């Protein structure tokens, strides 16, 4: 037993080193060397070993990122050195004045600056003791911040242990939400009738102040760290060298910074980034300029509010005035009615803008938006066009107040507003708009990725009665497509090939494509990898679901409700019969013998060495099948602690009952 325990300990330590190495490759170097599936395999193996040997669990284990308990609140914690805000510069003149002040304090000395991107997020502080992450906090008022350690640990870009055992290090940076995650989050909130986040910064701040860390974990946040706040021991001599050292420690820094020898170089570098800021996958609202020499920083010192050795250059907000030509309603795949303003086209943030979402009736009323109004338009977080305000003083008397329809503009059914939600919804489950938007979502790039099946052809197929739901797509024939507008022989053949190819997509893609409320792309992948098959997910209990990291009660309830409906069960059955993949393939270094091929298992009770999902995965990897109920077709019932009625039924039917020890032996058979 001692040898076995030592082997487990050695394997756990090796797995942690390997997982941390891959985190460093992915988040710090941006050079991943393994697939997501291979990474998940390593994590699952580590989880299994730690469940069997809880004495081996350590605070810095990659498995400890998402805590299970909901917090009651956040306590205040002091910063060792105040987290001061920066003074602002709004033009070239302000930058040159900053340079003049710096040089007046350092007469005759060479001054170099480091210029960095100003990430539009939430300022955070991380404490490491002997290389281990022990605390994470917000900036707060600069003197006191909020302890949000449990939420910051869910961000995979933050290392739980550094590559070197530094006695004490406080490092400061910015937590942010990528643009694509912000768009998906707001789309999901809009469909759910929840208030929208105004920009990625607010979304990041709101996500980090969640009392339930599972919600934070599902929000796909990231970080860039940009400075040493406090350190026990010697600092590198310059800010640029500090950034390089932080990177060596495994801390993620932004690579797009530059050392400049003059204020002219600073201004040139800022101009370059002002022109290409919209190409970034995250929002920036300016640039930060710092004196490079830490010794010079020390002599320059600070005022009561901000350091003398740094300044933030703020990009001007890109806004434009347009006319609201009309307000139209779009019905989404969950029945939400979303008003959209049709605008006179204007140039904004590098694109032509002709539409702006108005989100819901409340926002239209709050801003008193009318058809015909002159409106100030900007892009929220440089992404989504929005109306900031209208100009009542410019009204001519011909403007028309907008009234949300009481019936669905697509099907004529009653529209209701659910208590506690901002959204109005169509009450018709068979609304044609819901079907259309559901199919468009199903074929989208992040879901089943069926190239060539755009909104136009989907509308034609629906109008022609050929397609009512996603399963109908797999019944389409060449003759059906060639008759559609703008569909020639070649495009019809290519589309049929794309539909056929989509049958081999991952289970995660299919789950996301089904459009289950609150189940985003990330949650779909997690569910697919955890359960391994559609059948297993459909049989999952609420307890099974909420026991998964990043799956909270709201998602669990939505999944249970979706699979309880007969029409959805029928849709999945038809997709399966059409040949659509219902399994999540796991990449394995060695092929597993199919020793359980054709055998049906039921697992009941609590197993010591396996979670329910792990036991199921082990059976399915060997060719077996797992059922949620005992019948005459069941071959084995695996019994853990507190098994319940399934154990009794198995005895009555004379089915072979396996203890956990028996089950392990069966799995080990060659």
Curated annotation (Swiss-Prot):
Q: Which reaction is catalysed here?
A: NAD(+) + (deoxyribonucleotide)n-3'-hydroxyl + 5'-phospho-(deoxyribonucleotide)m = (deoxyribonucleotide)n+m + AMP + beta-nicotinamide D-nucleotide
What residues bind NAD(+), as annotated? 36-40, 85-86, 116, 139, 174, 290, 314
Tell me where the signal peptide lies. none
Could you list this entry's UniProt keywords, alphabetically sorted.
DNA damage, DNA repair, DNA replication, Ligase, Magnesium, Manganese, Metal-binding, NAD, Zinc
Output the Gene3D superfamilies linked to this UniProt entry.
5' to 3' exonuclease, C-terminal subdomain, 6.20.10.30, BRCT domain, DNA ligase/mRNA capping enzyme, Helix hairpin bin, Nucleic acid-binding proteins
Q: Give the enzyme's EC designation.
A: 6.5.1.2
Recorded GO CC terms? cytosol
Q: Which residues bind Zn(2+)?
A: 408, 411, 426, 431
Entry's SMART domains? BRCT, HhH1, LIGANc
What does the record give as cofactor? Mg(2+); Mn(2+)
Q: Does the keyword NAD apply?
A: yes
Active-site positions on this chain? 118
Q: Name one Pfam family in it.
A: DNA_ligase_ZBD
Q: Which residues form the BRCT domain?
A: 591-670
- Give the Gene Ontology MF terms in alphabetical order: DNA binding; DNA ligase (NAD+) activity; metal ion binding
Its annotated function is as follows: DNA ligase that catalyzes the formation of phosphodiester linkages between 5'-phosphoryl and 3'-hydroxyl groups in double-stranded DNA using NAD as a coenzyme and as the energy source for the reaction. It is essential for DNA replication and repair of damaged DNA.
Q: Which NCBIfam families does the UniProt record give?
A: dnlj, PRK07956.1
| Family in the record | Belongs to the NAD-dependent DNA ligase family. LigA subfamily.
Q: Which PANTHER family match?
A: CHROMOSOME TRANSMISSION FIDELITY FACTOR 18, DNA LIGASE
| Protein name per UniProt | DNA ligase
User: What species does this protein belong to?
Assistant: Desulforamulus reducens (strain ATCC BAA-1160 / DSM 100696 / MI-1)
The organism that produces this protein has a lineage beginning with:
Bacteria, Bacillati, Bacillota, Clostridia, Eubacteriales
Name of the gene encoding the protein in the UniProt record? ligA
């Amino acid at each position: 037993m001692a040898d076995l325990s030592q082997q487990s300990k050695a394997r756990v330590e090796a797995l942690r080193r390997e997982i941390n190495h891959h985190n460093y490759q992915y988040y710090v170097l941006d050079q991943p060397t393994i697939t997501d599936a291979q990474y998940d395999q390593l994590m699952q193996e580590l989880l299994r070993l730690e469940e069997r040997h809880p004495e081996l669990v350590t605070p810095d284990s990659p498995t400890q990122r998402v805590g299970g308990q909901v917090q009651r609140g956040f306590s205040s914690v002091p910063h060792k050195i105040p987290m001061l805000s920066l003074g602002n510069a709004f033009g070239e003149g302000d930058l040159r004045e900053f340079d003049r002040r710096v040089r007046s304090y350092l007469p005759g000395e060479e001054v170099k600056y480091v210029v960095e991107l100003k990430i539009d997020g939430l300022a955070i502080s991380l404490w490491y003791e002997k290389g281990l992450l022990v605390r994470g906090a917000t900036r707060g008022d600069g003197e006191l911040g909020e302890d949000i350690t449990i939420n910051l640990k869910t961000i995979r870009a933050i290392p739980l242990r550094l590559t070197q055992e530094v006695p004490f290090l406080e490092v400061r940076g910015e937590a942010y939400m990528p643009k694509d995650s912000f768009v998906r989050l707001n789309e999901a909130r809009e469909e759910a009738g929840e208030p929208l986040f105004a920009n990625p910064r607010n979304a990041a701040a709101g996500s980090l102040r969640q009392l339930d860390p599972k919600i934070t974990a599902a929000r796909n946040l990231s970080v860039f760290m940009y400075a040493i706040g406090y350190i026990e021991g010697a600092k590198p001599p310059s800010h640029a060298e500090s950034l390089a050292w932080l990177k060596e420690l495994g801390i993620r820094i932004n690579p797009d910074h530059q050392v400049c020898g003059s204020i002219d170089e600073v201004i040139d570098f800022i101009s370059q980034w002002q022109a290409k800021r919209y190409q970034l996958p995250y929002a920036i609202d300016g640039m930060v300029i710092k004196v490079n020499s830490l010794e010079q920083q020390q002599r320059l010192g600070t005022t009561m509010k901000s350091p003398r050795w740094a300044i933030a250059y703020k990009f001007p907000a890109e806004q434009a005035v347009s006319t609201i030509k009309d307000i139209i309603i779009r019905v989404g795949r969950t029945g939400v009615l979303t008003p959209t303003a049709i605008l006179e086209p204007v140039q904004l943030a590098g694109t032509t803008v002709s539409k702006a979402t108005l989100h819901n009736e409340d926002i239209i009323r709050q801003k008193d938006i009318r058809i015909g109004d002159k409106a100030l338009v900007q892009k929220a977080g440089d992404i989504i066009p929005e109306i900031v305000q209208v100009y009542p003083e410019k009204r001519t008397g011909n403007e028309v107040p907008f009234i949300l329809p009481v019936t669905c503009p697509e099907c004529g059914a009653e529209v209701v507003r659910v208590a506690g939600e901002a959204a109005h919804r169509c009450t018709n489950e068979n609304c044609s708009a819901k079907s259309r938007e559901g199919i468009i979502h199903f074929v989208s790039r992040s879901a089943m990725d069926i190239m060539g099946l755009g909104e136009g052809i989907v509308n034609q197929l629906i109008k022609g009665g050929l397609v009512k739901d996603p399963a109908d797509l797999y019944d389409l024939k060449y003759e059906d497509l060639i008759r559609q507008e703008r569909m020639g022989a070649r495009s019809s053949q290519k589309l049929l090939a794309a539909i056929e190819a989509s049958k081999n997509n991952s289970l995660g893609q299919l789950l996301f494509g089904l459009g289950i409320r609150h189940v985003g792309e990330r949650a779909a992948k997690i569910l697919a990898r955890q359960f391994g098959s559609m059948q297993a997910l459909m049989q999952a209990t609420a307890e099974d679901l909420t026991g998964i990291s990043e799956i909270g009660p709201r998602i669990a309830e939505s999944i249970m409700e979706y699979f309880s409906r007969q029409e959805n069960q029928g849709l999945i059955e038809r997709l399966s019969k059409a040949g659509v993949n219902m399994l999540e393939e796991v990449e394995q270094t060695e092929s597993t013998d199919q020793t359980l091929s054709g055998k049906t298992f039921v697992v009941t009770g609590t197993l010591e060495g396996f979670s329910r999902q792990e036991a199921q995965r082990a059976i399915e990897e060997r060719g077996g099948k797992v059922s949620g109920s005992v019948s005459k077709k069941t071959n084995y019932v695996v019994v853990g602690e507190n098994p319940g009625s399934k154990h009794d039924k198995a005895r009555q039917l004379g089915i072979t009952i396996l203890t956990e020890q028996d089950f392990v032996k069966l799995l080990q058979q060659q």
